[in-house]
Amino acid sequence: MKQQVEVRQLREGGYVVIDDEPCEILSISVSKPGKHGAAKARIDAIGIFDSQKRSIVQPVTAKIYVPIVERKRAQIISVTGNVAQLMDLETYETFELEVPEELKDKMEQGREVIYLESLGKRKIERMA
């Protein structure tokens, strides 16, 4: 899910959709309005799920999509290689996610993890 807001309402550390990918905002710089135009904002962001840097330039009055990013808890059912089978602790839905490199040694059956969900994508963020 996503909602529309004006560019002037965005803040560093917030989220924005760039190229249909939810991104975390790293920096926002606003240029002053010129003789024949409105102020423009340059937004530098990094993809939540693919860690790719992206940037856009928009007028501050333009509307832009902001993803709704949810943090949820899940229990590890099993770990096979670098794929973990998880069960959401609220909906009891089971699904598989790739295990981040830094968490591979900590993944054990029965432990809990925090994962991000936005625009139909999921990612393990950290251990609970």
From Swiss-Prot:
One of its GO terms (molecular function) is translation initiation factor activity. Keywords: Cytoplasm, Hypusine, Initiation factor, Protein biosynthesis. Pfam families: eIF-5a, IF5A-like_N. One of its GO terms (biological process) is positive regulation of translational termination. One of its GO terms (cellular component) is cytoplasm. Gene3D superfamilies: 2.30.30.30, Nucleic acid-binding proteins. It comes from the Archaea. CDD domains: S1_aIF5A. It is found in: Cytoplasm. InterPro entries: IF5A-like (IPR001884), IF5A-like_N (IPR048670), NA-bd_OB-fold (IPR012340), Rib_uL2_dom2 (IPR014722), Trans_elong_IF5A_hypusine_site (IPR019769), Transl_elong_IF5A_arc (IPR022847), Transl_elong_IF5A_C (IPR020189), Translation_prot_SH3-like_sf (IPR008991). Its main location: cytoplasm. The modification Hypusine is found at residue 35. Belongs to the eIF-5A family. Functions by promoting the formation of the first peptide bond. This is Translation initiation factor 5A. It comes from Archaeoglobus fulgidus (strain ATCC 49558 / DSM 4304 / JCM 9628 / NBRC 100126 / VC-16).
